[in-house]
């Protein structure tokens, strides 16, 4: 049971400090300093163990948040990791990368700062690894059933681990040369050092999961052979078709998609031989004036990356207006709030420009040298140009970080013959099943661009569906349905 007076004794939210900006810009390590145990215990003590814990509603995984908060308060760390792992395969990922929709749903947040749920989660799993409590959990016996998982992002990894532990023989296919999907090549090292991913993959290998990187299913292996070789297939390739900006000058050299840029920086951190004679990757911000188009998380990832590469000026454009400093009335508690946020990357520099639309890229000798843009306002649900607001901004590197529109259809999905939704995602039934028998879909490939916590939840739920398809029943947890939606 929680301390009934804890939230009265400790009324303020406390988080670990970020390392000083001048220091962290000199390396690619994670930005946060260590958090002391007493401060963490105080934060866990603030949890009220609500009769109706709305934090559960905010988390699609159904994490047992009040339970492990209280276990941390009482110093029962090993019990805490057992509770945490009961609902989340990878708290080491979510504790670093999830925007924590559980926190704005915290009841304490109605009139105080919410409990620092995400930080408590991260400290539990990091301590568990440090103490050697995270061990492989191979199945007691094998079922003789085989499953192919296509895609090694969080949805694919969660599905693979659950199915392996259920006794199925699981092979994960990844078209890139390393396992991890966007966790490997999309997320910068300063947000999550890849050693955290690698130790999880080591655990999964020890449990019996087979990984096959460098295999592009639909190209190197046909859809027909995949279905013939495996009893079930889980599609978890993500929503990797990026949103384009079809304006004059798009073809100019120096205009790149974020997901063309970020992987190079990650490959450098992996130690790959990708540097030119000047010690720079093929796409670099060193010594350049950079404009990032897109104000979301991917844009912030680009922002932190170009700072570390040595950009001399950075602007980040967002077509939407600047959010309010406090929770907007349109997103009341317990929904995820629309509000102005300053990430670690924003703290490091650059200028954020809101309510602006880019209309053309200007080039010199085939290379981008500037862009033309104007301010916009919202009128009847549409963006309208503000007359007389035109401007031109110098730029010799432009990064498009405007999100993703759905999965890539060419190749595997077309060959399989799966049906799609009106929004372009892979259509699925109530059990994550596609229109093709024995083929299931989890994560962004079926849901559309979403959060890591939804990807893991869908991976777990799809694993339960596959297990039930193969065995007739399943004891695996299924935290979400395909139709589940965030609090709104």
UniProtKB/Swiss-Prot annotation:
Keywords: 4Fe-4S, Amino-acid biosynthesis, Glutamate biosynthesis, Iron, Iron-sulfur, Metal-binding, NADP, Oxidoreductase
Other comments on record: Was identified as a high-confidence drug target.
Cofactor: [4Fe-4S] cluster
Matching NCBIfam families: GOGAT_sm_gam
Listed name of the protein: Glutamate synthase [NADPH] small chain
Textual note on the cofactor: Binds 1 [4Fe-4S] cluster.
Entry EC number(s): 1.4.1.13
Biological process annotations from GO: L-glutamate biosynthetic process
Metal-binding keyword on record: yes
SUPFAM superfamilies attached to this UniProt entry: alpha-helical ferredoxin (SSF46548), Nucleotide-binding domain (SSF51971)
Gene Ontology molecular function: 4 iron, 4 sulfur cluster binding; glutamate synthase (NADPH) activity; metal ion binding; oxidoreductase activity, acting on the CH-NH2 group of donors, NAD or NADP as acceptor
Statement: the UniProt record of this protein carries the keyword Iron-sulfur: yes
Enzyme class: oxidoreductase
Pathway stated in the Swiss-Prot or TrEMBL entry: Amino-acid biosynthesis; L-glutamate biosynthesis via GLT pathway; L-glutamate from 2-oxoglutarate and L-glutamine (NADP(+) route): step 1/1
Domain 4Fe-4S ferredoxin-type, first and last residues per copy: 38-69
Entry's Gene Ontology cellular component terms: cytosol; plasma membrane
Alphabetized Pfam families for the sequence: Fer4_20, Pyr_redox_2
Catalytic activity: 2 L-glutamate + NADP(+) = L-glutamine + 2-oxoglutarate + NADPH + H(+)
């Amino acid at each position: 049971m929680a301390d009934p007076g804890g939230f009265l004794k400790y009324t303020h939210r406390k988080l670990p400090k970020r390392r000083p900006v001048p220091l962290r810009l000199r390396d690619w390590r994670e930005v946060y300093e260590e958090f002391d145990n007493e401060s963490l215990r105080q934060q866990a003590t603030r949890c009220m163990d609500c009769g109706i814990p709305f934090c559960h509603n905010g988390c699609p995984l159904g994490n047992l948040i009040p339970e492990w908060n209280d276990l941390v308060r009482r110093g029962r760390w090993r019990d805490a990791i057992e509770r945490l792992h009961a609902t989340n395969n990878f708290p080491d990922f979510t504790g670093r990368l999830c925007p924590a929709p559980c926190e704005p749903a915290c009841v304490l947040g109605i009139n105080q700062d919410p409990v620092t749920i995400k930080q408590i989660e991260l400290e539990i799993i990091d301590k568990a690894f440090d103490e050697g409590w995270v061990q492989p959990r191979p199945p007691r016996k094998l079922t003789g059933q085989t499953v192919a998982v296509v895609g090694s992002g969080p949805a694919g990894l969660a599905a693979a681990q659950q199915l392996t532990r259920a006794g199925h023989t699981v092979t994960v296919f990844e078209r890139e040369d390393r396992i991890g999907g966007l966790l490997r090549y999309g997320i910068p090292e300063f947000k999550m050092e890849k050693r955290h991913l690698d130790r999880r993959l080591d655990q999964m290998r020890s449990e019996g999961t087979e990984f096959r990187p460098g295999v592009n299913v639909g190209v190197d292996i046909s859809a027909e052979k995949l279905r013939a070789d495996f009893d079930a297939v889980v599609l978890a390739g993500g929503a990797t078709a990026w949103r384009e900006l079809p304006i004059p000058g798009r073809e100019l050299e120096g205009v790149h998609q974020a997901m063309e840029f970020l992987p190079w920086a990650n490959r450098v951190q992996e130690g790959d031989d990708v540097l030119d004679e000047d010690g720079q990757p093929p796409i670099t911000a060193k010594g350049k004036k950079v404009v990032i188009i897109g104000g979301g998380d991917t844009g912030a990832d680009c922002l932190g990356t170009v700072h570390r590469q040595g950009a001399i000026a950075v602007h980040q454009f967002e077509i939407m207006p600047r959010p309010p400093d406090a929770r907007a009335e349109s997103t009341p508690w317990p929904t995820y709030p629309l509000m102005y946020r300053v990430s670690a990357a924003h703290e490091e520099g650059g200028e954020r420009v809101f309510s602006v639309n880019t209309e053309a890229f200007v080039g010199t000798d085939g290379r981008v040298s500037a862009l033309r843009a104007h301010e916009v306002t919202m009128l009847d649900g549409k963006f309208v140009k503000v007359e007389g607001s035109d401007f031109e901004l110098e730029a010799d590197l432009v990064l498009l970080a405007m999100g993703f529109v759905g999965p890539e259809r060419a190749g595997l999905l077309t060959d399989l013959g799966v049906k799609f939704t009106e929004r372009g995602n892979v259509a699925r039934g109530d059990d994550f099943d596609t229109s093709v028998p024995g083929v299931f879909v989890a994560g962004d490939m079926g849901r559309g661009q979403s959060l890591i916590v939804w990807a893991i939840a869908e991976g777990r739920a799809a694993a339960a569906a596959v297990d039930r398809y193969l065995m007739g029943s399943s004891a695996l947890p299924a935290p979400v349905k395909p139709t589940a939606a965030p609090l709104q």
